[in-house]
Amino acid sequence: SINEKEYPNIYKLYSEGISYRNNYSPRNNCNTGNNEMTAMTSLFTINNTCTADKYKNNVYPEAIFNMFKNAGYTTSSYHDYADFYYSRKIIHPNMGSSNYYNASRLNIKWSSLYAEWPSDVDLIKTATPHFINEDKFMVFMTSVTTHQPYTVSSEYGDKHLSEFSEYNYSTAVKRYMSKMKELDAAIGLLLETLETSSKLDDTVIAVFGDHYPYGLTNKDINTVLDYDVNVDKEVDRTPMIIYNSATPKEEITKYTTMIDLLPTLLNMFDVDYDPRLYLGHDTFSEY
């Protein structure tokens, strides 16, 4: 759960920012690729195919990168793993990302075994120098440390394991929580870097989860949450946050998903857009 003791930086964003309390991640056979694409385009994907790969060669003039690029922002995107499964190095530029950096371009060590995932702290360390000195930047980062598996030993699954000894959770849950500590540290480093560069008050940070931790059983997840994930597909409820240090906190309880993120951000930044071309809603509007 999101608490100040274990995850002070995530808690800060969630408790001091705009938090979406009934946000859900669509479930399909390509959760990460499709839901990332949905966030970037505000379009629904095809649930039985990896839409982001099948249509990677299309151009997307209304995608988030192009919209902010047209508004005068420098655009770039980053991921701390390889492109074995998702073709970000193709589709991101076609959406308007001027530069896409994967783990190899960032000189982050990674494994091809899909077991040892890199540290998101390294993602922040290596990515921020590429954009932090720009006057106006729009950046998309895809983190990876918290990914499954949780049932086997791993570097970051075990790194903070002892810190959760007081909790009566399964080892798999504790490994997930250990990995979350690394993500929390990465967010803390990002906040620190922005503040040191005098950019924090003028930066909006949006965070969403592409899917629930399906490497855990529903039974395991129920030991942590205060609601039953087996009821009404509550297991698919995931956090979504928009944070700016100078913006008052707000809890939004209407039902949302990442498809609503782009229209909301375009409204926040007063970017001219045609809402007929987006399937999501501006969450600050009445609907």
Task: Map each language-model feature to its residues.
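Solvent-exposed soluble domains appended to multi-pass membrane proteins
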Residues: 1-287
